[in-house]
Amino acid sequence: MARAFLFVLDSFGIGNAPDAEAFGDLGADTLGHIAEFCAAGAADRAGLREGPLHLPNMSALGLMHAARLATGRLPAGMALPERVYGIYGAASEVSRGKDTPSGHWEIAGTPVTFDWGYFPAEGDAFPPELVEAICREGDVPGILGNCHASGTDIIARHGEEHMRSGKPICYTSSDSVFQIAAHEQTFGLERLLNLCEVVRRLVDDYNIGRVIARPFVGSDPGSFTRTGNRRDYSVLPPEPTVLDRLQEAGRTVHAIGKIGDIFAHQGVTRLTKANGNMALFDASLEAIEEAEDGALVFTNFVDFDMLYGHRRDVSGYAAALEAFDARLPDLDRRLKPGDMVILTADHGCDPTWRGTDHTRERVPVLMFGPTLRSRSFGIADSFAHIGETVARHLGIGVGPHGRSLI
């Protein structure tokens, strides 16, 4: 029996999606613009990285071919490898948002065909009656922020007042999200998580996709740092995903990183938390060593999005891609006959783009394993085909929204 390993490089888009203009993202290209900056020397950073973007392993799996499919051109400074060792292509999203749950649920075979609720960008983000209910039921003296913001910026702006007053920092973005930042010592991590559970219940009436706990430490704006104790409180997917179908078939689903939170822990058999891309990679390798026949190992590599995409850090994003790429031989050595690895993404977050939000992009789909022969599948018209490829590979029924790419 086969095994499948699904790795989501969070926000690693490869060129604007066909409907990008409707999202204000026409021209966005996470990979292309990172490569362009690297080729021009604009992503050099002392002690971190320098020179053209160097992704030899993903290139050998078809990444540059996929990028050319998505955009019609090669990323700057990049060349096609002499040989490709995997099945490759690009995929466009059909879900109506460019957020994390929409992307992941669609990858798992369940597109989001409804509209999420969003909070306004002008004025106070949250309705007065919601703020009042949060203060009353969450037992807090008020809130700070109440706006669209970058997480690191708003913590720097309000962190000291939060520590003095005990008021949590509440903010949102262009995603369907309610984020709460609080100090782990002065406010307390457990209290923050309890507050998020209260808010999760309260924002259900507003059709908000996620409530996110954003704990931080430090004593002043210069030392405030978000910790690895982030927690996402998502609603349930609108219908069963490939995770549910695997679980019903008696298979093991290993959820690593924030995968469990994204799926509200539905369809998850084993949960592993880790902080940082390299720790997530290590945890994935450990799960692969343990995974039995028929199992799925599903990992989200969040640093690309959280640390570099939203913060518009081109050098950091490039270095993170290069570090991930360098680990792929460690993965390849652990594969057995019948194993399949899929590298993909859930949306874009172009670090050269205006603002701090996600970008509507096509994503790469790179599939490899000891028994897979190299070819292109072209451009898939839904991320759902990724999940159904997993379903077919693992020998369970294909769902209603996609088809296998192999």
Curated annotation (Swiss-Prot):
TM spans (from-to): none
Positions contributing to Mn(2+) 2 binding: D305, H310, H358
Molecular function via GO: magnesium ion binding; manganese ion binding; phosphopentomutase activity
InterPro entries, per database record: Alkaline_phosphatase_core_sf, DeoB, Metalloenzyme, Phosphopentomutase_DeoB_cap_sf
Reactions listed under catalytic activity: 2-deoxy-alpha-D-ribose 1-phosphate = 2-deoxy-D-ribose 5-phosphate; alpha-D-ribose 1-phosphate = D-ribose 5-phosphate
Superkingdom per UniProt: Bacteria
Pathways involved: Carbohydrate degradation; 2-deoxy-D-ribose 1-phosphate degradation; D-glyceraldehyde 3-phosphate and acetaldehyde from 2-deoxy-alpha-D-ribose 1-phosphate: step 1/2
Subcellular location: Cytoplasm
Co-factor requirement: Mn(2+)
GO cellular component terms attached to this protein's record: cytosol
Binding site for Mn(2+) 1: D10, D346, H347
Pfam families reported for this sequence: Metalloenzyme (PF01676)
Gene3D superfamilies registered for this protein in UniProt: Alkaline Phosphatase, subunit A (3.40.720.10), Phosphopentomutase (3.30.70.1250)
EC id: 5.4.2.7
Assigned keywords, A-Z: Cytoplasm, Isomerase, Manganese, Metal-binding
Cofactor remark: Binds 2 manganese ions.
Primary location group: cytoplasm
Enzyme class: isomerase
NCBIfam families in UniProt: deoB, PRK05362.1
The family this protein is said to belong to: Belongs to the phosphopentomutase family.
Protein name per Swiss-Prot or TrEMBL: Phosphopentomutase
